[in-house]
C-alpha cells in the first residue's frame, strides 16, 4: 500500500518535471526571436538556476559535505554530460537538422536506457517494453510532425545521438545516485558545473553568446526580457531538474524516461495556450501513442517486478513509502 503511494508520488513528480521542462521551448523562443543565441539562453538558464538552488542545497545537506564529496565524480559527469553536454549537443544538432528531427534523435535516449539496462543488469527487454518503445517512438514522430519530407544531415544526426546519450545519462545517474545525496544538492552541483562549462565555452568562442535586454513578445504581450529568463531558470531548470531527479529515484531510469516523453506533449500544449499554435489531429494521435507506450512499460514493470533489492530506485521507493506513511 505504502509503496503504491510512493509510486504514485513518483508519477506525479515525473509528470510535473515533464510539464516544467515542456515550458522551456516557449520561454526560450521569446528570447531567441529577439536576437538571443540559443547558447546564451541555455547558459543564463543554467547559471541562474544554479544560484537559486545553492542555498536550499546547502540546507538539505545539513553539513554533510562528505556526502557531496563522495559523489563528486557522479555529480561532475551529471553536470557535464546530462546538463551542459546534452543541451550543447542538441543546439549543434539543430544547426544541421530540423528541430523535430533533432528532438526525435535526442529522445532516442529512452532506447539507449533499455539497452543499457540489458547490458549492465541483464534486464532483457520483454515484449511489452518493446511494444511500448515502438508506440512511444511512433507517437514522437507524429507529435513532432515528422511525417513527410525531412532534411537529414550526417553531422546533425551524430550531434542528435550525442544529445540522446546526454538524456540517457540524466535518467541513469538520477536513478543510481546515492540516496543520501539530496536531489537539491545533486541538481545544484550539476548545474554549477554545467554553467561554468557553458560560460567557459562561450568565452573561448566555442559557443556563440548573443543576448540583449529588449522587451520580448510572450503570450501575445510585450514583457520584459526578465520574464522568460526567470521562467527558464526557475521553472524549466531549477524546479524541473529537482523534480526529475526525485521522480527517477522512485520510478527507476526506464519508466521515468518513458514518462519524461510527455514533455513534448506539454510543450505542444504550452505552445497552443501561449503562442496560439493549435495542435493537429496527427499530433493528438501521437500523444495517445506516447501515453500508450508509457502504460505498456508500466504494466511490464508491474508484472515482472524486476527491480533488484539494491537498486537505488528500489531504496528510494522504500524510503518514500516510509515518509508517506
Model-derived segments and spans:
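Glycine-/small-residue-enriched transmembrane alpha-helix faces in small-molecule transporters
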Residues: 1-44, 149-176, 197-200, 313-325
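C-terminal-most transmembrane helix of multi-pass membrane proteins
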Residues: 2-3, 46, 145, 225-227, ...
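Hydrophobic alpha-helical transmembrane segments of multi-pass integral membrane proteins
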Residues: 8-13, 40-56, 132-135, 155-162, ...
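Juxtamembrane C-cap of transmembrane helices in multi-pass membrane transport proteins
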Residues: 19-35, 48, 87-97, 105, ...
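Specific transmembrane alpha-helical segments of multi-pass solute transporters/efflux pumps
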Residues: 20, 54-102, 106, 142, ...
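Hydrophobic/small/kink-forming positions within alpha-helical transmembrane segments
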Residues: 22, 79-84, 88, 110-115, ...
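Specific alpha-helical transmembrane segments that line the substrate/conduction pathway
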Residues: 40-51, 90-124, 163, 253-272
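Hydrophobic transmembrane alpha-helices of multi-pass small-molecule transport proteins
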Residues: 53, 108, 115-116, 125-146, ...
